[in-house]
């Protein structure tokens, strides 16, 4: 009667390794720049997300605004100074010349494996 319990325990031990959880790490945590300068933000995934990565901008008291989807496509109405690149595990958001309204919080988000 102990064998099934032991087997179940072993299977449960392995479950965390099969969930496919993807961790995204952004860098740098903060940037000190001035208007007119170039900003480069990085996002690294713990495993490949192909090109299924989006970038968002959020300002205080506002909902996040989609900037880039599928790694390199600008969302509707997003200025050309915003560009995205990368695939697999390494991605970059570049703001070619910062405008005063660009000073905000930026997030990356993957959509390769929704729960």
UniProtKB/Swiss-Prot annotation:
Disulfide bonds join 43-108. Keywords: Adaptive immunity, Cell membrane, Disulfide bond, Immunity, Immunoglobulin, Immunoglobulin domain, Membrane, Secreted, Signal. SMART domains: IG, IGv. GO terms for molecular function: antigen binding. Residues 77-108 are annotated as: Framework-3. It is found in: Secreted; Cell membrane. This is Immunoglobulin kappa variable 3-11. It comes from Homo sapiens. Immunoglobulins are composed of two identical heavy chains and two identical light chains; disulfide-linked. CDD domains: IgV_L_kappa. Residues 44-54 are annotated as: Complementarity-determining-1. It comes from the Eukaryota. One of its GO terms (cellular component) is extracellular region. SUPFAM superfamilies: Immunoglobulin. Residues 109-115 are annotated as: Complementarity-determining-3. Residues 70-76 are annotated as: Complementarity-determining-2. Pfam families: V-set. GO terms for biological process: adaptive immune response; immune response. The keyword Signal applies.
């Amino acid at each position: 009667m102990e064998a099934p319990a032991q087997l179940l325990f072993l299977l449960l031990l392995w479950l965390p390794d099969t969930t496919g959880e993807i961790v995204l790490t952004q860098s740098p945590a903060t940037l000190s720049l001035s208007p007119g300068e170039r900003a480069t933000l990085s996002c690294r995934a713990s495993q490949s997300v192909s090109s299924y990565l989006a970038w968002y901008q959020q300002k205080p008291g506002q909902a996040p605004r989609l900037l880039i989807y599928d790694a390199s496509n600008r969302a509707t109405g997003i200025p050309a100074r915003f560009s995205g690149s990368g695939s697999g595990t390494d991605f970059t958001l570049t703001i070619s010349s910062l405008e005063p309204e660009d000073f905000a919080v930026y997030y990356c988000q993957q959509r390769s494996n929704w729960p």
